[in-house]
C-alpha cells in the first residue's frame, strides 16, 4: 500500500473519529461528513487513475454531486434549527417533527 493511500485512509479515519467525538453540534458533524466525502473522492480518483479504469471515470464526479446535495440539505437544516432554537445542537432535531 502506497503512502498516498495511507494518508487518504488516515484523513478518512480522522474525519470518522471527529464525527463520533463531536456529534453534539450539527455544524461539526457536517464538517466531518464533508471531510469523509472528500477523502473518498480522492481515494476513488487515485484508484481509477492508477488502475487505468476509464469506464468508471465518472464515479468520483457523481460522488461529488451527492456530497454537494448532502451539504446543501445539511446547511438548510442547520439554518432552520438555528433560527428556530438559537443553537445548533443535534438534540433539537427531535423537536422539528410535525
Swiss-Prot record:
GO MF entry, a single one: NADH dehydrogenase (ubiquinone) activity
Pfam families hit by this protein: Oxidored_q2
Gene (name only): MT-ND4L
InterPro entries, A to Z: NADH_UbQ_OxRdtase_chain4L/K, NUOK/Mnh_C1-like
Any single Gene Ontology cellular-component annotation: mitochondrial inner membrane
Gene3D superfamilies tied to this protein: 1.10.287.3510
PANTHER family attached to this UniProt entry: NADH-UBIQUINONE OXIDOREDUCTASE CHAIN 4L (PTHR11434:SF0), NADH-UBIQUINONE OXIDOREDUCTASE SUBUNIT ND4L (PTHR11434)
The protein's name in its UniProt record: NADH-ubiquinone oxidoreductase chain 4L
Catalytic activity: a ubiquinone + NADH + 5 H(+)(in) = a ubiquinol + NAD(+) + 4 H(+)(out)
Membrane topology: Multi-pass membrane protein
Transmembrane segment boundaries: 1-21, 29-49, 61-81
